[in-house]
Amino acid sequence: MSTSSSAVSQLKNSPLAGNINYEPTVWSRADALKVNENDPTTTQPLVSADFPVMSDTVFIWDTMPLRELDGTVVSVNGWSVILTLTADRHPDDPQYLDANGRYDIKRDWEDRHGRARMCYWYSRTGKDWIFGGRVMAEGVSPTTREWAGTPILLNDKGDIDLYYTCVTPGAAVAKVRGRIVTSDQGVELKDFTQVKKLFEADGTYYQTEAQNSSWNFRDPSPFIDPNDGKLYMVFEGNVAGERGSHTVGAAELGPVPPGHEDVGGARFQVGCIGLAVAKDLSGEEWEILPPLVTAVGVNDQTERPHYVFQDGKYYLFTISHKFTYADGITGPDGVYGFVGEHLFGPYRPMNASGLVLGNPPEQPFQTYSHCVMPNGLVTSFIDSVPTEGEDYRIGGTEAPTVRILLKGDRSFVQEEYDYGYIPAMKDVQLS
């Protein structure tokens, strides 16, 4: 891990954040070569193929617990709340029937991203989730897809800011404000009617659609820096520049061993964890800052970045795929992490490689879209689990929760809990 200004120029002065002088931390190929998919301390337990499904009518994937700006997962009047990316299942739709008239769940599942909607669920137990419905009515969001973000409980009046991604056409970080109403019977999320687009990729720090038609720009996660008290946001991006124009230089290589100097087509993998700062705690105006971590020549996706603040350290987590790694290096689908003592870095890859929690090699696609909470619990969804022969079972439901122990720059897998167990760390009673 090193810092370099070769991929992204550093920022000298920010109108909103003040005098900032930092360079992105480079996740190098040498770091990634240390990834060990068979390390039991960073491997998620096997998910059984007889897993329960939380809904027969919808698929769910990215899960977003309701939280406060310091990361605390909250319940409201005793009700836990999660948001999920959601799409209807189509078992009777002729479009998803095979030649024998059987439901092709695999194709239905693979098509879900184009019809993703933000929905909510509630529970008294932190599991046994009850479906509440859509957060925004049809037509409220200005694009065809509602992709992942973060719901923030603002106060004890029940106001919620949902930061999310407006996708197709384009991709923009957006915010919509509503409120939560509870009763003895359940929960309603109401009045999420006015979406405000906050910013898009700028082409200077973050790659735009014009620079790369398969660019990544999504997954806002706002937080208050425990040191300076300002409101920031991390998000997924790609390092700016025309596709194929990036250089995998000495910093991006790192101290690789002999025989690993050839990077093939690694210049096409240009993932990064982006940063923005708000004008004030209202979160209405934002300024884009340079990336915190770049993965040029390593990986093209650093999805759903988010923080855990513990023991004076900044634990910055992200998720990524095996298929988005660059030529010559590999790693499992799962959680990757970086740790430092300051928001602006420098950061070090956790466990030397960056890998925190990966799928087991025998079930490489069992779970994804992990969210690490401040209590060490990690939630994810089930993608597909092998059954007999070459067959497998599609999930689209919550995976078993696991706990990880954070110890300095290292992490260790600990207990496994029930499917979709996302307990509140604090209950907020509405006034």
Curated annotation (Swiss-Prot):
GO cellular component: periplasmic space
Annotated catalytic residues: D62, E303
Site residues by UniProt (Transition state stabilizer): D219
Top enzyme category: transferase
Coiled coil: none
Catalytic reaction(s) noted: [6)-beta-D-fructofuranosyl-(2->](n) alpha-D-glucopyranoside + sucrose = [6)-beta-D-fructofuranosyl-(2->](n+1) alpha-D-glucopyranoside + D-glucose
Name of protein: Levansucrase LscC
Taxonomic lineage of the native organism: Bacteria, Pseudomonadati, Pseudomonadota, Gammaproteobacteria, Pseudomonadales
